[in-house]
From Swiss-Prot:
GO MF terms, alphabetically ordered: ATP binding; magnesium ion binding; phosphoribosylformylglycinamidine synthase activity
Coiled coil: none
Domain of life: Bacteria
Catalytic activity as recorded in UniProt: N(2)-formyl-N(1)-(5-phospho-beta-D-ribosyl)glycinamide + L-glutamine + ATP + H2O = 2-formamido-N(1)-(5-O-phospho-beta-D-ribosyl)acetamidine + L-glutamate + ADP + phosphate + H(+)
Protein name as it appears in the record: Phosphoribosylformylglycinamidine synthase subunit PurL
Binding locations of Mg(2+) 1: E94, N533
Family matches, as NCBIfam families: FGAM_synth_II, PRK01213.1
Organism field: Bartonella tribocorum (strain CIP 105476 / IBS 506)
Positions contributing to substrate binding: S95, H96, N97, H98, R117, Q241, E313, S314, Q315, S535
Length: 736
């Protein structure tokens, strides 16, 4: 008798597995008996939020997922979008929040490893990575340790694997003190006629284990990722996986070689819930059963139980359904790369998930109910209470607006992230055109192609807290804007929805309205969601994170030689504001960090205006009218002007329109706006083009001198701006 299956199932054990009483009763009804301990673990893993999306699936179905360039939407390992010339971009963003809080280095590293596998499992070679990171308050005793560990883990894995990090975000807020967020994005390039999917096909075909050996690391990781934290957090350290980027690199090359051979029927990486999830997903999608023999699984630890082998989340592993006639050639490829290749089972026609260990059947369950027919909830939700818009006149104007700008540039959220991204290899593969520190990262598709891909990741959690619907819209719109500032056409997006406990109606309401806002923005901006991830129960001792629906997007440049950057402005260029002058100070960085107030509604997002302005900006870039472009977001016009000055090392002399109070015009965070550095000879053409396309422009000034001079308000030298901007992070990390 398998030792773990001698364990009596008690209410305590059921609760430890994250299953509710009604869910356990459903299991009893489904299988007509009490589950074994291993079967209970399998149900726990497959029915938790991390794998089943049981609280969010109803609402995720409302998102737009189709488009003229979409090849594969949600439901596969990653989304796939056509980029022409027989090629496609494969991409996804996924969270590794809970593990990264428990063990920051390995949690973040294996988050990168997992998303890399999601992409190359489909036949794509990874070409770009991003990460969106949220940490607690800078003065919290764990924050610096977590920042150091997470950044080191991301760099350690992605640098060793050999994928450039081209962008990302880092923010701080006390609401993340007990639950940091680590959202990792990877994109790869594949041939459109050589994509590989996870749907198993054919009866009696071998199921093959590929990659590294199985250990006890990560056992129960998927269940842990679907639960709130409490004071026992340190006890969960063993549920964090350990990664090896060099093995992953070998796995990439072996998989791509195997795919070239034509041996793959279906393939799935072993991520959350490990062998259980990969086997169940492949079988359930293909309406087939799967039978496994654990005696043939390569293990690195002695006396592993069936429970441990089925739920281990050891890294750098794949599961494949193989064409049997190519077994010898396939095995030779993996052995050449120093990886394990073991036939551990077969496909069957009985829709059962059966597992054998030491001559005993330890699992016999219906595969569809484990997989795509897992429970789905329509949880109660309450509509978020909307805040009223703040009038600029009701927000205090500080005496020295220049000092306010310097304070913001030297703050946790607005300062340079150079300390972070200089730990990442941003140039490996040799195709990076725009590196971190700009609105979007850009890479060439190849050194023989004029085409390039642009990437951005965005969300403003404080907006989402104040109004989840507008916050969801704004996250999409800002990502779309950032891609547009390079001249790239936004193609599609992936979402990473990070929220608290969905069993609380107010939290579920945040999720519902954020998804509604995301959906509306994606529909109007023609920016479909093709993949994604939901991370719930981001709470510690009942305190939830800020609602954080991260949006990462991809755009296409048909000719990268026409691309512009934030830093490209030249002396004599005209600085033009696209859109109206600032007036909205509700939920602004100015209100929060200068006045220490949290009040008012976030700025509303006019999606039709966003669409018109974005198309205009892309057109004038393609027409060669501008040297530089930058979107206006956190901190408003003042921060955007300062960032252009800092990046270019050149001054700007500008004058406000006086349509709003000075503090509102400088720091208002009105949406749908851009700054352009326009070539002098192109100014009239730009104005005419704006007039014919109903786009509002304001001439602010010109590029000149060595200071940011806002006429009659403040003059700040380029050097003082750079010093304020660059000093905060190194000082915070104790390097000054």
């Amino acid at each position: 008798m398998n030792p773990c299956n001698n364990i009596t199932i008690t209410p305590e054990i059921i609760a430890q597995h994250g299953l509710k009483e009604d869910e356990y009763q459903r299991i009893l009804t489904l299988i007509g008996r009490e589950p074994t301990f291993t079967e209970l673990g399998i149900f726990s893993a497959m029915w938790n939020e991390h794998c089943s999306y049981k609280s969010s699936k109803k609402w995720l179905k409302t998102l737009p997922t189709e488009g003229k360039c979409v090849i594969q939407g949600p439901g596969e390992n990653a989304g796939v979008v056509d980029i022409g010339e027989g090629q496609c971009v494969v991409f996804k963003m996924e969270s590794h929040n809970h593990p990264s809080y428990i063990e920051p280095y390995q949690g973040a590293a294996t988050g990168v490893g997992g998303i890399l596998r999601d992409v190359f499992t489909m036949g794509a070679r990874p070409v770009a990575a991003m990460n969106a990171l949220r940490f607690g308050a800078p003065d919290h005793p764990r924050t610096r340790h977590l920042v150091s560990g997470v950044v080191s883990g991301i760099g350690g894995y992605s640098n060793s694997f050999g994928v450039p990090t081209v962008g990302g975000e880092v923010n701080f807020d006390k609401r993340y003190n007990g639950n940091i967020l680590v959202n990792a994005f990877v994109a790869g390039i594949a041939k459109t006629d050589a994509l590989f999917y996870s749907k198993a096909q054919g009866i009696g075909l071998p199921v093959v284990y590929l990659g590294a050996k199985t250990g006890r690391d990560g056992v129960g990781g998927a269940t842990m990722a679907s639960a709130e934290f409490d004071d026992s957090i340190s006890e969960k350290r063993p549920t964090v996986q350990v990664g090896d980027p060099f093995t992953e690199k070998c796995l990439l090359e072996a998989c791509l070689e195997l795919m070239e051979l034509g041996a793959v029927v279906a393939i799935q990486d072993m991520g959350a819930a490990g062998l259980t999830s990969s086997a169940v997903e492949m079988g359930a999608k293909g309406n087939l059963g799967i039978q496994l023999n654990l005696d043939t699984v390569p293990v690195r630890e002695e006396n592993m139980t069936a429970y441990e082998m089925m739920l281990s989340e050891s890294q750098e592993r794949m599961l494949m359904v193989l064409k049997p006639e190519l077994e010898k050639q396939a095995a030779a490829i993996f052995h050449k790369w120093g990886l394990h290749f073991s036939i551990i089972g077969k496909t069957t026609d009985d829709l059962r998930f059966r597992v054998f260990h030491q001559g005993e059947e330890v699992v016999n369950l219906p595969i569809k109910e484990l997989g795509d027919e897992a429970p789905v909830y329509d949880r109660p939700w309450s509509e978020p209470v909307k805040k009223t818009l703040l009038k600029a006149e009701d927000v205090k104007k500080v005496e020295n607006l220049g000092d306010a700008l310097l304070t913001l540039l030297n703050s946790a959220d607005q300062s340079s992230r150079r300390w972070v991204y200089e730990q990442y290899d941003t140039l490996i593969q040799g195709n990076s055109l725009i590196c971190p520190g700009s609105d979007a990262g850009v890479i060439r598709i190849s050194n023989k192609s004029k085409r390039a891909l642009a990437f951005s990741s965005d969300v403003t959690p404080r907006y989402c807290e104040a109004d989840p619907y507008e916050g969801g819209k704004q996250a999409v719109a800002e990502c779309w804007r950032n891609i547009s500032t390079t001249g790239a056409t936004p193609l599609a997006a992936t979402d990473n929805l990070n929220f608290g406990n969905p069993e609380k109606p107010e939290i579920m309401g945040q999720l519902v309205f954020a998804i509604k806002g995301i959906g509306e923005a994606c529909r109007i901006l023609d920016f479909p969601i093709v993949s994604g991830n939901v991370s719930l129960y981001n709470e510690t001792n009942g305190g939830a994170i800020l609602p954080t629906p991260t949006i990462a997007g991809v755009g296409l440049l048909s000719d990268w030689s026409k691309m512009v950057t934030i830093s490209g402005m030249q002396n004599g260029d005209h600085i033009i504001l696209v859109g109206d002058c600032g007036s909205h100070l509700g939920q602004s960085i100015y209100a929060r960090d200068i006045l220490n107030i949290d009040a008012g509604a976030p700025p509303p997002v006019d999606l039709q205006l966003e669409k018109r302005h974005g198309q205009f900006v892309r057109d004038v870039i393609h027409n060669g009218f501008v040297h530089a472009a930058h979107d206006i977001s956190d901190g408003g016009l003042a921060i955007a002007l300062a960032e252009m000055v800092i990046k270019a090392g050149k001054g700007i002399k500008a004058k406000l329109s006086n349509k709003s109070p000075h503090h509102a015009e400088l720091f208002g965070e009105d949406q749908g706006r851009y700054l352009l550095a326009v070539k002098p000879e192109a100014l009239n053409n730009l104005k005419e083009y704006a007039q014919t396309h109903a786009v509002s422009l304001t001439e602010l000034g010109q590029v000149e001198g060595d200071s940011l001079n806002i006429d009659g308000i403040f003059t700040l030298s380029v050097e003082s701006l750079i010093q304020a901007y660059e000093n905060w992070f190194p000082k915070f990390m104790g390097e000054e």
